[in-house]
């Protein structure tokens, strides 16, 4: 018997329960990724019911905190509700994270919602080169996990004015910018490996993971060959957009012909992203509390919710 309840898109959309849509078409356009076509229908039928579910979870957590405050006779700031969103490169998890961030921030009982991507915790390019793992960017070993876990731990401890490094997809490196995170009501952490746990490292049983701090977890899923196709399509769009910007690490790819670019993207997928998906990301899927399963057209077709 499956540990998940399965919902068709139509059945799931009914769980919206008349919650009003608070985002406009313009809002959605600003939130979607380069290779996504996020429609109002998708937002209403998939993400609005999900925001309602998450709101109920947050409310339950806030009620529990108020009991604790009553018992301790204090009004200390409650720790944030932390949501993790995982999935492959090019599957659309960043768009999912941005849409949920926007929707959740419009609920009156938790208006302060922050979104942090784990990209900011990648080792700088120089260090990846020194370690000889530049070709493994995105793999667990390419992240400063100690720094990432410390950040999430500090957020949960209620520490104010935390700083998160900012990553640039143009320079392919950590920048000098920082993002401030100051005791949000809800924190969304989006990244490839946020659902990894001690089960992935049996030789190191005392290690602490981001997943240890999550209150709710989402995995954005699709067939591997479908994601590969999306990756190639995204690569071709970047080739005509982001790769042409001054200082772009990938500017040399703009000189490739269309066919050469397709072959290069397929090679990168085959040698890096596909392996990372199979070895490190996909094994964490079953740990998620909710799985959004997408079809070839980028639309969510099935929702799996842990019982």
Curated annotation (Swiss-Prot):
It is found in: Cytoplasm. ATP binds at residues 87-94. Its main location: cytoplasm. Pfam families: PRK. Its EC number is 2.7.1.33. GO terms for molecular function: ATP binding; pantothenate kinase activity. CDD domains: PanK. Keywords: ATP-binding, Coenzyme A biosynthesis, Cytoplasm, Kinase, Nucleotide-binding, Transferase. Pathway: Cofactor biosynthesis; coenzyme A biosynthesis; CoA from (R)-pantothenate: step 1/5. It catalyses: (R)-pantothenate + ATP = (R)-4'-phosphopantothenate + ADP + H(+). This is Pantothenate kinase. The gene is coaA.
């Amino acid at each position: 018997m499956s540990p998940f309840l399965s919902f068709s898109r139509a059945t799931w959309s009914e769980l919206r329960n008349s919650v009003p849509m608070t985002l406009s078409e313009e809002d959605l356009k600003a939130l979607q990724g380069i290779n996504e076509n996020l429609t109002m229908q998708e937002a209403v039928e998939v993400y609005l019911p999900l925001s309602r579910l998450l709101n109920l979870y947050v409310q339950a957590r806030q009620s529990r905190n108020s009991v604790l405050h009553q018992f301790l006779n204090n009004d200390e700031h409650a720790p944030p509700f932390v949501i993790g969103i995982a999935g492959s490169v090019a599957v659309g998890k960043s768009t999912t994270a941005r849409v949920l961030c926007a929707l959740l921030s419009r609920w009156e009982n938790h208006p302060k919602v922050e979104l942090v991507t784990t990209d900011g915790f990648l080792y700088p390019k120089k260090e990846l080169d020194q370690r000889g793992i530049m070709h493994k960017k995105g793999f667990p070993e390419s992240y400063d996990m100690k720094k990432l876990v410390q950040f999430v731990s500090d957020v949960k401890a209620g520490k104010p004015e935390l700083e998160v490094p900012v990553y640039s997809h143009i320079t392919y490196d950590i920048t000098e910018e920082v993002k401030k995170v100051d005791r949000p009501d809800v924190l969304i952490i989006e990244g490839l490996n946020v659902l990894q746990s001690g089960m992935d490292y049996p030789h190191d049983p005392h290690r602490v993971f981001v997943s240890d701090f999550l209150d709710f977890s989402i995995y954005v899923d699709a067939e591997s060959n479908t994601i590969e196709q999306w990756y190639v399509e995204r690569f071709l769009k970047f080739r005509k957009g982001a790769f042409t910007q001054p200082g772009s690490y990938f500017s040399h790819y703009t000189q490739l012909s269309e066919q050469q670019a397709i072959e290069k993207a397929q090679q990168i997928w085959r040698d890096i992203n596909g392996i990372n998906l199979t070895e490190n990301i996909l094994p964490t899927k079953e740990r998620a509390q909710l799985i959004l399963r997408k079809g070839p057209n980028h639309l969510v077709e099935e929702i799996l919710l842990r019982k």
